[in-house]
């Protein structure tokens, strides 16, 4: 096993422990608490995959961090903080909307790069909006925390989430995953639009309805549908 993989996990465990102490003292805001819950699940999966005990890893991670802080000068810390670009955390969803469990009558799941796409194929003829919580840097989506598809009644019918086993994704990864989710939902005659926040930062080529432009495949499908309807109308006449 790569020693850097182990040490990274150990440090992540200790830093999560520190953040948990902050949350326990009620010093964390909603995005902070949201990331804390999601990172806990991710650490459990990583620990299981690596075969490492989280409690032991946390103690070793503490030793690594303490050694680094002991060697780090205040001036170097100031320079590091000053040179790091600041990211913003944007929220379309409340904590309740993000943490709510949901169920699918006809589940479909697809992995697109480092992202997992899930949708309920039983949903038909609904107006659906995509909402997401994510961070932005340099006016571009940096990290997707979670994206969910909601009906007008508030039911969750789809989701895009990062795969813990494949950390890191690009703005293009997110755009492609959104296209897959929209295509899957529209297959059952649902009308899908995205939130204004997503429309602004996830892609720049959406139309005024919050819809991404049709892909060539979607255009061909629409053309076939129109031709089929025209033929049926002629036969009826």
UniProtKB/Swiss-Prot annotation:
Region Disordered, annotated ranges: 205-237
InterPro entries: NS1, NS1A, NS1A_effect_dom-like_sf, uS15_NS1_RNA-bd_sf
GO terms assigned for molecular function: protein serine/threonine kinase inhibitor activity; RNA binding
Chain spans, region CPSF4-binding: 180-215
Comp. bias regions, Basic residues: 217-237
SUPFAM superfamilies the record matches: Ns1 effector domain-like (SSF143021), S15/NS1 RNA-binding domain (SSF47060)
Intervals of motif Nuclear export signal: 137-146
Main location per the UniProt record: host cell
Subcellular locations according to the entry: Host nucleus; Host cytoplasm
GO biological process: symbiont-mediated suppression of host cytoplasmic pattern recognition receptor signaling pathway via inhibition of RIG-I activity; symbiont-mediated suppression of host gene expression; symbiont-mediated suppression of host mRNA processing; symbiont-mediated suppression of host PKR/eIFalpha signaling; symbiont-mediated suppression of host type I interferon-mediated signaling pathway
Keywords: Eukaryotic host gene expression shutoff by virus, Host cytoplasm, Host gene expression shutoff by virus, Host mRNA suppression by virus, Host nucleus, Host-virus interaction, Inhibition of host innate immune response by virus, Inhibition of host interferon signaling pathway by virus, Inhibition of host PKR by virus, Inhibition of host pre-mRNA processing by virus, Inhibition of host RIG-I by virus, Inhibition of host RLR pathway by virus, Interferon antiviral system evasion, RNA-binding, Ubl conjugation, Viral immunoevasion
Chain ranges for the short sequence motif Nuclear localization signal as given in the UniProt record: 34-38
Region (RNA-binding and homodimerization): 1-73
Modifications after synthesis and translation: Upon interferon induction, ISGylated via host HERC5; this results in the impairment of NS1 interaction with RNA targets due to its inability to form homodimers and to interact with host EIF2AK2/PKR.
Gene3D superfamilies (alphabetical): Influenza virus non-structural protein, effector domain, S15/NS1, RNA-binding
Region (PABPN1-binding): 223-230
Pfam families the UniProt entry points to: Flu_NS1
GO cellular component terms, semicolon-separated: host cell cytoplasm; host cell nucleus
Protein function: Inhibits post-transcriptional processing of cellular pre-mRNA, by binding and inhibiting two cellular proteins that are required for the 3'-end processing of cellular pre-mRNAs: the 30 kDa cleavage and polyadenylation specificity factor/CPSF4 and the poly(A)-binding protein 2/PABPN1. In turn, unprocessed 3' end pre-mRNAs accumulate in the host nucleus and are no longer exported to the cytoplasm. Cellular protein synthesis is thereby shut off very early after virus infection.
This protein's domain notes: The dsRNA-binding region is required for suppression of RNA silencing.
Family: Belongs to the influenza A viruses NS1 family.
HAMAP family: INFV_NS1
Self-association and partners: Homodimer. Interacts with host TRIM25 (via coiled coil); this interaction specifically inhibits TRIM25 multimerization and TRIM25-mediated RIGI CARD ubiquitination. Interacts with human EIF2AK2/PKR, CPSF4, IVNS1ABP and PABPN1.
The name this protein goes by in its record: Non-structural protein 1
Organism per entry: Influenza A virus (strain A/Japan/305/1957 H2N2)
Lineage: Viruses, Riboviria, Orthornavirae, Negarnaviricota, Polyploviricotina
């Amino acid at each position: 096993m790569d020693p850097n993989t182990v040490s990274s996990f150990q440090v992540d465990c200790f830093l999560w422990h520190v953040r948990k102490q902050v949350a326990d003292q009620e010093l964390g805001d909603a995005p902070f608490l949201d990331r804390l819950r999601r990172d806990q699940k991710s650490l459990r999966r990583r620990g299981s995959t690596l075969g490492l005990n989280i409690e032991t890893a946390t103690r070793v991670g503490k030793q690594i961090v303490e050694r680094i802080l002991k060697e780090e000068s205040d001036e170097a810390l100031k320079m590091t903080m000053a040179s790091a670009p600041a990211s913003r955390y944007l929220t379309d969803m409340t904590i309740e909307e993000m943490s709510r469990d949901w169920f699918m009558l006809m589940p479909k799941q697809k992995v697109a790069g480092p992202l997992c796409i899930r949708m309920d194929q039983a949903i038909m003829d609904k107006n659906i909006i995509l909402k997401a919580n994510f961070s932005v840097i340099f006016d571009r989506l940096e990290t997707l925390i979670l994206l969910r598809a909601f009906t007008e009644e508030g039911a969750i019918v789809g989701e895009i989430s990062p795969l813990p086993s494949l950390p890191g994704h690009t703005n293009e990864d997110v755009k492609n995953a959104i296209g897959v989710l929209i295509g899957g939902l529209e297959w059952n005659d649902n009308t899908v639009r995205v939130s204004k926040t997503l429309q602004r930062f996830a892609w720049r080529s959406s139309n005024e309805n919050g819809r991404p432009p049709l892909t060539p495949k979607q255009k061909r499908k629409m053309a076939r549908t129109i031709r089929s309807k025209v033929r049926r109308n002629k036969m009826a006449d």
